[in-house]
Amino acid sequence: MSERINTPFTNEHFVAFCEKMVGLPYWYGTVVYKCTENLRARKAKQYPAHYGSSRTTRYRDDIAKKKVCADCVGLIKGYQWTNGGQGVIESIGTSKTFSSKYGGHGCPDKSANGMFSYAKSKGCAWGTMDTLPEVPGIALRFDGHVGV
């Protein structure tokens, strides 16, 4: 395996981070944050349709288990904002914290669709599914969502 997997901000390192985040909770509107009651309450106020009472038990379970959460584009932004995921994985299930810098490494705070438009405006290649190159870590976007 390439040594690039150990080098932050390479596509291989990013993919390794994403793979370690598989199975962690999806909280709408979050960007690689520790699950806390304060965060849940703020997001419930900001996005009431996504934080209804039917989901509260699940959110509180995530909090009790000291998990880390993100939404789709939040995973991408969070990797950048935490300096390549520094300390994130180690904090899962513990009381450890990690640093996050809003807009870190030049990564803007945009929605999935907004990030797609931003990438196009910066000259990034894009196309249809049949033109998608087999490059680990490439973003695949459809309206309102993005995956790696």
What are these regions (language model features)?
Residues E134-G137:
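Loop/turn positions that initiate beta-strands
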Residues G85-K120:
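Short, basic/aromatic beta-hairpin or loop at an interaction surface
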Residues M1-I92, F142-H145:
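N-terminal capping segments
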Residues T131, R141:
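Short, glycine/acidic-rich beta->alpha junctions
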Residues T10, D71, S111, T128-M129:
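Helix N-cap and loop-to-helix transition residues
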Residues K120-D130:
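Short alpha-helix capping/helix-loop boundary micro-motifs
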Residues V31-Y33, G103, S121-G123:
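Short linear sequence elements within intrinsically disordered, low-complexity coil regions
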